[in-house]
Amino acid sequence: MEIKVTEIKENKLLGRKEIYFDVIHEGEPTPSRKDVKGKLVAMLDLDPETTVLQYIKSYFGSRVSKGYAKAYESKERMLYIEPEYILVRDGIITKEEE
């Protein structure tokens, strides 16, 4: 699995960086969210507690998936802005923490 960052936008109003990337997975199934997030965080030197993987989209017959992640400046801002289901899906909070 290889990740190529296609665009990084600074969103000062929401206090985050918006990261668009391609995941190249030749001869492999689409990688898990956990694997992609781990590699992206390590590659860009981000904090895993304030980084949210919004989506990974795979297209039939393609060996490349497209993804979108958001890296927040603080955990408080992330918890205020992001929908609960995204935080649960990324493992940042659990369902019981509501």
UniProtKB/Swiss-Prot annotation:
Q: Which GO terms of type biological process are on file? A: translation
Which GO molecular function annotations are given, in alphabetical order? Answer: structural constituent of ribosome
A Pfam family annotated for this chain is: Ribosomal_S24e
Do you know which InterPro entries this protein is assigned to?
A: Nucleotide-bd_a/b_plait_sf (IPR012677), Ribosomal_eS24 (IPR001976), Ribosomal_eS24_CS (IPR018098), Ribosomal_uL23/eL15/eS24_sf (IPR012678)
Q: List the keywords (alphabetical).
A: Ribonucleoprotein, Ribosomal protein
Q: Which domain of life is it from?
A: Archaea
Q: Name one GO cellular component term.
A: ribonucleoprotein complex
Q: Supply the PANTHER family for this chain.
A: 40S RIBOSOMAL PROTEIN S24
Tell me which HAMAP family the record gives: Ribosomal_eS24
Which family does the entry's similarity section mention?
Belongs to the eukaryotic ribosomal protein eS24 family.
In Swiss-Prot or TrEMBL terms, this protein is called Small ribosomal subunit protein eS24
Q: What organism is the protein native to?
A: Thermococcus onnurineus (strain NA1)
Q: What is the gene called?
A: rps24e
